[in-house]
């Protein structure tokens, strides 16, 4: 947005390539997506590319996911149960009726209508707009439309509200998992997050070549309009003079003068002084107790059997709330975690699930507390966690052949090293409580010329949300210039 409007833009990135959390890890001879794996809200990217005089499809090849996600449970009373979710509501209702009965299918239809209503209320007033106060949000929605505002259900928890739609505990688990999309527990996250179901019904896409191609496309679009990118470039300090930004000092001592800086990192790095004492007032660091989920991940290359993998797969144990109590209260990892698997080469379930492969490239993920700055996991502990995760998958039918497996693990302390001052939190602040969405800072900081973007600021975590945050920062900068 800034480069296409004639501003001189330089992007300084401490990593060797663009993308941040949207990274790849080399395992053997393969590269595996190791960060966000779900591509939704395509309109956000279409709008960005359109405004820059280009088309998204000129830079990215996207395939509509035939199945949004495949879910399986190990619970003894439901051994071998499996449910696929599709973008079409009636197709899902039919699948849910077969899976859990007609009452649950009717509950699902009502749940979808509620999620769509919430999304329509908040899309343009909150998600795609500058951060409002609670009162400003009510103003945007309209005082004559307070009923719609009330139906966004910020005072209710997602877990409690799901109980009004679903009696089958497996469905409550499945839709409660949407809280983890913003790094939170369904027991404490607001029911407003029901809108995520509608986001997925609008479409999930698979990016040909892997999610890193999204970052590559954004770099190419920026360069097309004159933006310059410098990688392996560590900023030691954002320099301030007379209350406003004047530039940055790099790790090697080089000083670069800028009229403005957009900081696209976790706000805790500012608040803890990692970019210099003068900018600590720009944003308060997120307290450890308020951090979102971290994870232990394994990028795996191995032969699999026994389970028809789709691109997105979720394997559930039976006690979902125990998992979040362990992470958020006891600061540990349950022995029977929910396991997410992104099978990167399984793009079309109708074809791929029946193909015998020599090897699958997979991201395997379990939730963990964001304590990577105060504790670390030993190799023995990581191996035990891997075995626990593999047991859950095995009991759901998926066998990973250890004799063919190569893997690279990343625990919370690894994520903290990649994203300093986070403790390994992957989504900024946990979205717990009715006011959590207003606790994130907006595009402006407490320092003139310093703007904020990324998953720890408004409108929140996720690839499309982080993209929106960058556009809001550019918008605010231009507005501050009086344009």
Give the positions of each predicted feature.
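N-terminal glycine-rich phosphate/pyrophosphate-binding loop and immediately adjacent elements
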Residues: 1-121, 430
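A conserved FAD-binding loop/helix module that cradles the flavin
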Residues: 36, 455-481
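Rossmann-like flavin
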Residues: 77-188
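A glycine-rich dinucleotide-binding beta-alpha-beta segment and adjacent secondary-structure elements
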Residues: 168-182, 334-340, 399-459
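Helical element adjacent to the flavin cofactor pocket in flavoenzyme catalytic cores
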Residues: 195-251
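Active-site-proximal substrate-binding core of FAD-dependent oxidoreductases
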Residues: 237-240, 478-483
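C-terminal segments that line or cap access tunnels to active or ligand-binding sites in enzymes
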Residues: 303-416
């Amino acid at each position: 947005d800034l480069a296409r409007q004639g501003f001189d833009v330089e992007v300084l990135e401490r990593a060797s390539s663009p993308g941040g959390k949207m990274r790849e890890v080399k395992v053997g001879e393969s590269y595996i997506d190791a960060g966000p794996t779900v591509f939704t809200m395509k309109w956000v990217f279409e709008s960005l590319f359109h405004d820059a005089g280009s088309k998204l499809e000129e830079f990215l090849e996207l395939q509509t996911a035939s199945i949004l996600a495949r879910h399986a449970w190990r619970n003894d009373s439901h051994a071998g149960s499996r449910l696929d979710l599709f973008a079409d509501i009636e197709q899902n209702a039919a699948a849910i009726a077969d899976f859990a009965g007609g009452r649950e299918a009717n509950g699902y239809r009502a749940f979808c209508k509620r999620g769509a209503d919430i999304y329509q209320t908040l899309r343009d007033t909150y998600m795609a707009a500058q951060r409002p106060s609670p009162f400003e949000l009510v103003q945007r929605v309209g005082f004559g439309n307070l009923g719609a505002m009330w139906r966004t259900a910020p005072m209710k928890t997602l877990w409690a509200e799901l109980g009004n739609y679903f009696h089958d505990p497996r469905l409550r688990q499945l839709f409660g998992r949407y809280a983890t999309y913003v790094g939170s527990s369904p027991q404490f996250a607001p029911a407003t997050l029901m809108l995520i179901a509608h986001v997925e019904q609008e479409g999930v896409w698979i990016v040909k070549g892997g999610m890193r191609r999204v970052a590559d496309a954004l770099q190419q679009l920026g360069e097309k309009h004159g933006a310059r990118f410098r990688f392996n470039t560590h900023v030691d300090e954002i320099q301030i003079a007379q209350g406003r930004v004047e530039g940055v000092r790099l790790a090697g001592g080089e000083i670069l003068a800028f009229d403005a800086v957009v900081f696209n990192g976790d706000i805790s790095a500012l608040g803890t002084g990692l970019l210099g004492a003068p900018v600590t007032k720009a944003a308060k660091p997120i307290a450890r107790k308020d951090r979102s989920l971290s994870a232990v991940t394994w990028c795996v290359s191995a032969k699999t059997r026994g389970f028809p993998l789709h691109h997105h797969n979720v394997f559930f144990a039976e006690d979902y709330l125990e998992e979040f109590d362990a992470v958020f209260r006891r600061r540990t990892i349950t022995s029977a975690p929910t396991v997410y698997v992104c099978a990167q080469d399984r793009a079309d379930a109708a074809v791929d699930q029946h193909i015998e492969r020599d090897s699958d490239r997979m991201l395997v993920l379990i939730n963990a507390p964001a304590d990577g700055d105060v504790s670390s996991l030993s190799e023995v502990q990581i191996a035990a966690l891997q075995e626990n995760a593999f047991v859950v998958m095995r009991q759901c039918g998926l066998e990973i052949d250890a004799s063919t497996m190569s893997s690279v693990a990343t625990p919370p302390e690894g994520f903290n090293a990649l994203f300093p001052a986070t403790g390994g939190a992957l989504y900024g602040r946990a979205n717990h409580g009715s006011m959590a969405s207003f606790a994130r800072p907006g595009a402006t900081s407490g320092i003139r010329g310093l703007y904020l973007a990324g998953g720890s600021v408004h409108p929140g975590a996720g690839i499309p949300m982080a993209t929106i945050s960058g556009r809001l920062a550019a918008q605010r900068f231009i507005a501050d210039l009086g344009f």
